Each structure stands twice: as structure tokens, then as C-alpha cells.
């Protein structure tokens, strides 16, 4: 099922109360005046948080979140096991303490807390406050622009004790050019179209001074050339500088879990013709940017190459991947955990174990896709799952079970998107899901209980088929169960232990709400309901969802109707139709 949505808008694309005036000679454009009340800059003062975005603690299943209403921002800590939600701060007390230290006046409703993070112990938080006063010049700061003074704090949640970190300096920022190995000992990066490595010690030196002459760089490759080099990301902005290797970048590689190897895919674009764009963001004037792009019908296509590097001796070799003309190679990666979201310098790790990883190989027309495996020591990748269709084939990320001994594969092979369980040899063990409905994506795999959680739509009768729900099923195909029930669109966050779920849900004509669920869908506690009070006070009314038949008289089309401000149900109105 393709996610196409018909949007019908009658007149102006905002809806509010019947108090709108009718057109008159004295006021020829009342609709525009009324519409201005709902312009983007005005909405930000009437519409606040609409979902809960959890920051899970590094240990356990507690999380914190920030939520804004018409009364300001509040921070909460939730303990799902204890079914409690408590304010993180005594905000009146905190405002007074911050005012005394920073010397800027603060209120409980307006605390400018930045970069709030929790420590490993689950009780200590750190954050910073930017003062209204200019900071003192630092001779080590490369940026000579005037900056505001920043104050750093730690906060002990159980005791509500605030500590001013007077001696703390600005955190050394994580360079975006570094790809750090999982063991943290090696840093690999691309520069001048080739790959280099350095030790963690030298990397730390460069974080403090990027011109430190004592740093030792070891060059791993020498074959990189223009339009066929290592670390050439696709970009529409600053393409001449970025895509031709004049900046350091992380190389877009994936490490083995034991840090002994990494794999990288690069593209040979030398025969592909140039395309040009205007970089309107350049200063002081727009610039002409050039990059490689294959237009429809052109024979010259990018050619993908896959290389494996051995860090024990700094050697590398190309892996044979060839099967389709003008094919594309994509490397499968290990998903990151929710508890890692605020962590810096995270490695990118391949999907698999220390000696094996997975890639997908796609034909140019996307009618043929292979899921392939590669084992270190071999010369070629080996296809284990083949997808063939006469039409465009979509892809979703693989999910690995037990380091890749089993794979959960997403496929539309029977006309509907479903999940299939394979062993690592490519033998189908069983279907996990089936039927006339659409699995959209895997959310979480609980390997211990052999349960997969996934988003799907179109299964519940009488609902808009575009509304996604969270489901769970056993890997053997049994036990299918809807977890997030209700005639809404559901946005979920499943914790790393697959025990609790933050559940945000709404429709176009309802106020968004957020609950905490257990992994079976039972409500543990209510979290939030969005504050629409100021929006309603300004005259806002919800648009109306509707369903009509398509021209074939069979297909249902779902849309949303926004009525004009001075809506007259007896009048014949024109409408705007947007289809994607």
C-alpha cells in the first residue's frame, strides 16, 4: 500500500469559528485578516508541545521529558515500574538559584535550560544556561566572534541540589569528521579523497587544537581521485568543497563489533555527467555548484564498490559485488539504542557479528534486489534472499536476531508488505505476518522473548488505512496483537528492554494525547494532553476528515477538508486539491 493522501482544501487552508465577518465594501479582505491570526509566527504563541519525546536513562527503564503548555516548560521524570511521574525540578526554587548565580532574572515558567542530560547513575543531571552578558575572550578559542557567557550546572534529582560548576570549561565539541571504532581506540576519517587513521590520543589532541603538529596520521589508501574517492557524500550544498574531498569527513563506514575491520562503499562517478545548482545560501553572493547526477535515459551511471579494511595491518581489499548492471550497494547497520541518544562519539557498527555482515544489492530499475552476506576471508558477497518484481521494489532495514543467525526481512512479494523470518543461509523459516494489510517498519525486536514490535496500517476495519498502529507478534508467526489501540494515528517509542512504550496519538480533529503503555498495550498511566486552549480561544476549529470514492467507483480516497472562514453551506465553492 503506497502512502498517498488526498488533501482537499476549500478556500483558505485554515479553519476557525463562525464569527468571521462577511465581505463588505468597507472591509474587502476580512478572510486574510482572520487568517493572519494563524500564521506560523502566531501559532508558536498558541500551540505548544503535541507529543512526549522520552530520554531514557542509561540504566533501568526510567525516562525524562520536557513538555510545554501555556504555563511554560516543565520537566518530568517517569518511573514506569512505580507508575510515577514527578517534576524533575522545583522550578520556583531553581529559578531563584539560577537568578542568584547568573544575575539574570528567571521565573519558574521561563527557565532557559539547555543541553539537559542525565548521567550514568540515573540521578545526576547536567545542563547549561546562557547569560545575557558577553563572555570574556579566551585566547584558545578559534572563533573570534563575541559570545555570551555560559554557566554550567549539575543537579542531583533525589535531593534537588543544584551545583554551579564554576571551574567547568566549554565541552570540547565532537568533530563531525571522526569515525570512532567501537573499542574507542582508533579514529578513521576521509581527507583529500583518501582514508586515514589516528590513535584516540592524537584525536583528543586535535579536539583541543586542530593544528597540533605532534599528531600522527597514517594514510590507509592512495587510490582516491576526483569523483571516485573515499568519503564523498552526496550534497546539494557546498558540493564542490564537500564532495571533492577538501574537508575531513567520517568516510561513512561501518565497523565490525570487535573493531578489527570496517567496510565502506564508494561510488565511481567519473563517467557521470555534471549537473548544476545555485547555492543561494552562499555569502556574500550565491554560487554555482557542480555535482554528478545521472539523468533518466543516460547510459553513464555511478558504479558502486565495496572495500573491507583490516586494522591489524592497515590493509584493504575490494569485495566482488557484481550482479546487475549499474547496481547500487547499501550496507546494513546495527540500530542504536534509545539510551544512546544523548551520547556523543558513538560508533557506526555493521549488522552481523565480528566476521560477517550484510548488504543489499539493487538493480538500477529496482526490479531486482538481493540481500547478501559476506564472511571475512571470502572474495565475494553471497545472495541469501532474492526479491524479483515487474515493478519498483521498496526496501526496509533488515533486523538481525542473535547477531545475524536469523534475519527478519520486510517484503512486498505477495502484494502486501509483511515480515519473514530467515536463517543466515537464506532459508525461509516462516512468515511472521500475512493478510491484506501493510507492515510499515520494524520498531523493536525482543530477542529473549522472540517477539517483534512493528508499525502497520490498513488492518483495522472501519479506520482510515493511513493510521499506523503498533503491533507485536512472535517470531514463529503466532500471537499477533495490536498494542496501540484506538482510531488514531499512533507515534510510539518502545524502550530498549521492550517493556514500556511511550504512546502519542491523535487525529486531525482531536487534541493530541500521550500515555505510557506496557508491552501488551495496557495503559500504565496517562502522561499529557496538549494545550489547545489559546488556539480555541482564537477561534480555531478542527478540519473535517472525509472519505470518497475514486473515479473507478471502487477505491476509497481519504482526505481532510479545511473550510473557509466565512463558510456558507448553501454556496458553490471552488477547492484546492493537493496529491502526493
Q: What are the residue ranges of the model-derived segments?
A:
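Bacterial N-terminal signal peptides that target proteins for export
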Residues: 1-6
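Beta-propeller folds
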Residues: 7, 20-512, 516-517, 533-541, ...
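Bacterial N-terminal signal peptides
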Residues: 8-15
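N-terminal cap/lid segment of alpha/beta-hydrolase-fold proteins
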Residues: 527-570
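Structural cue for short, hydrophobic secondary-structure segments
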Residues: 576-579
